[in-house]
Each structure stands twice: as C-alpha cells, then as structure tokens.
Amino acid sequence: MINLDFLTLRAFFKENIDFLIGSRLQKIQQPTRRDFVLAIRNCGESRKLYINIYPQMYHLCFMSKENEEKRNITIPQKPPMFCMLLRKYLEGARISDAIVVENERILELHFETYDELSQKRVLCLAIELMGKHSNIILYDKETSVIIGCAHNVGSEKSRYRELQGGLKYIAPPISERGLSNELKNQFKNLTQEKINEYLNKEIYNPAIKDDKYTLFAELLDGSTPQKSVNEMLDNYYASVQERVNVNAEKSKLLEIANSRLKKTKNAVSKISALLKKRDNTEKYKLYGDILTANLYVKADYQKNVELFDYVNNQNIIIELDETKTLNENAQRYYRLYTKSKTTKEKSEEMLSNLNIELEYLENVLYSINASKKLDELADIKSELGLVETKNKKQEKPAVEKIQIQGFDVYIGKNNKQNDYIVSKLAKDDDIWFHTRLCAGSHVLLKINGVEPSEEVLFECCKIARKYSSATQPSKVGVIYTRGKYLRKPPASPLGYVTYKNEKEVLV
C-alpha cells in the first residue's frame, strides 16, 4: 500500500485551498475511534472531508458518495466523547485559514469561533497524518493550550511530546536524520566528468514510436487516469479500505462457517459409525417369528430356549426373560424390532439431512471465498442467521448476467442468488449448469425459444467450472439439465436442488 507523503498532502491542499478557506463546518461525525467525517459547505457546495488516522491507512480526502459506501461507514447512535467535544467547539464555525506545515504531513484548519463572552477566538484543528503517531488535536491558537485529542499521549509513550487536554500543544520533533553513510560515500567521490557520463548515458532504448512520451506511456500502461489529486486519494484509499473490510468480514464468516462444518462432519461420522455397527433389527424380528412359531413348546419363565432357525436351517439358542412366558418374550422381541427399526430410519433420515447441510456449508465456504464485495458477504451473513431480517419485501438478489452469442447467462455468487436462479429465473426449457461433486455457482442459460449450439453449451460449462471450488488443473465434470428436471425439496437450505436427466461434460 502507498502511504500519504508531504508532497501529496501539499498537492491536495493547493487543489482545495479555495474551497476550504471561508467554508463553514456544518456537521461532525466519528464512525470509529480513528476516522472522522466533517461536512463542510462553501458557496452553495457541500463536501465531506474524510479523515482516517489508522496507522496503516492514514489519509484525508473529500469523499464521494460511491466511495463512502465502499468504506462501509456506519455512524454510531451514541457519538464518542471526542466527537461531542468537536461538535461543541467547531460545529457552525467558519474556517478562516488553513496551512500545511512545511515538510510535515500535518494539515491545520483554523476555525473562527466565539466564546461565552462573544469574544472572537481562533481554534486550530491539527490533523497529523504520521503513521502510528497519527492524531487529531484541537487547541487554542493564541494560547496553544490543547482542548482535546482523538487519543491522548502520556509520558510513558512519549517523553518529548505529551498530548492531552490542558497541556501546551508542541509540534512534532523535526527529524535530524541526514543522508546515510552509504549514500554519502557514493556521492563523495563523484567528479564532474563522472556526473556528465551518467547524464549522457542512455537509460531507455525502446523501439521507434511516434509517441514522444514513450517512457511515461509504458510506465503508466494499465493505470487509471484521475481527474484530480483528491479523486486519486479518495479512489485509492477507498478501494484499499474496501479490500481490508472485505477480508476482515471474510475471516469472521469463514470462522463461523468452518465451525459449523466441523460440527456437522462430526455428527455425520458418529451417525455413520452407529449405522455401520452390527444391526440387530432383523435379528429381533427373526427371534420373534421363531418364538411365535413355537408357542406350543414348554419354555415359559426360562433363561433361554433352543429352537430351529428355519431361515438359516440350524438350531439356535434364544435368550429369554425368565419372568415372562414364551409368548410374552416373542412380543418383547417384536417391540425391540419396532424400536430398532424406527431408530434406524430416524438415523438414516438424520444422516441424509446432515449430508445436505454438509453440501450447503461447503457451498457457503466457496461463496465466502469467492466474494469480492461487502454486499455479497452481507447476503451470506443474513443467510447464516447472523443478522436480523427486517419484515419488509425482500429485494431481488443482484445476480450477475453475461451474454454468450446473444444468450443471457446468469451466475449465482452465493446461495441466496443460487436459490433465486433455480426458484424464480429457471423456466422449463432453460438449461442449468453445475460442477459435479464440488461446490460452485449455479449457472443458468436462458433459451427464449432458441436452441443453443454445442459451442454455447461448452462455454457455459467452462463458466460453471470457473465459478467453483475446483482448483486442480485436471478436468472437472460439469453437469447440465433442463429447468423442468430441477426440484427443490421442501425445507431444504438455500441453493439446494435435486436434478435428473443430466448430461456431463469434462472441462
């Protein structure tokens, strides 16, 4: 990440000085401990000055609406203490002057205010953008007494410069570091002849081109031109912040989804092991049948009885309850059979549901890893039940749509979108694609009365493979079938579907 330096700050300042001086501060907001939004108005134009003093991302800029959404700014219901202090002293005040401290990453905004006796008073808001030492300090310009700081600095953190209310504001110390010894040694022995040799040396030798700015054209190839320094700062740091926010949200959701996946896998293992154990269900029924067929035998109130097993053609010894008659023992075995059969059926049903849940969670994990925007992760967060769903009409998911040779193709990026594709978009003749045996997006090819060529079908298969968890270089099976052969079982998770009459292509 590129950090803000003095030259960039000064360029931003020169670009916006005319708007800043004479403007009025209308509103102050503090989303977190280390970022602030100042709503400033001048000559009928309103802008939001965004200040970020996080050590890894310190910067300031006038923020666009689009980039405000990228930054995922949420204003707390109860403002922090420093925000309330700034509101008390600065809201409604006019910026009378603004300066960038020479060779420092410090912007000072001077506010013209009035005290309780209606006496004019100039307050300075020092915005210090200096890495881990970044801070915002409000102090009296005349007395240099600090009124408040975004975060206080005590003597245990800095012996030179304490920052807290009531103390004098001291500017940051000037760095006394000069050139390193290595650089000094390199420059010390330079003669005029050597300097001329370096100046005349060819450092770039491209092929002949008409563009006289060839060097810069090639260096800037692939970059995006910006209209202003402010736009550059706003767009760059908003994209960085969005990426940081997305990665942080991904980490949280992955931890939750992996935890659920682990629990589900453990449950599947336990039930599978239980079902694989020796099953006595049929044995209980056989014992009941044998005892019923031999009720004439005098074996009441005995510990066991030896009878002929007509299924396996051999004599067997059947354990009995000596407190019961032979008939009562037969009924006891039938009850054991019924209970065992019911338990087995319930276990198999539970195992089936757990396997569906397992497939669903694997799709969730894929969706989290594939997500690149916060709104996509918000869908997953809602899907996992981590946020309250409001009682209002649900908005249609923003499913990605592309075109292949005139055909519309829809791609689901999460289970909510996948479910919408299957439940709402897919018609009987449309063609649905998905990777076999691995998580991935649902891909839907809309037919609209025109049958697609083999080339179009193969392109859709390639898309289904691309948007899946299949990372190995070897070929992967992609299945496709008509919409009329899809079925969503009742009470099944989002995005879960069964299918038939499918075809498979290796991609």
Language-model region placement:
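Extended, highly charged segments
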Residues: 1-507
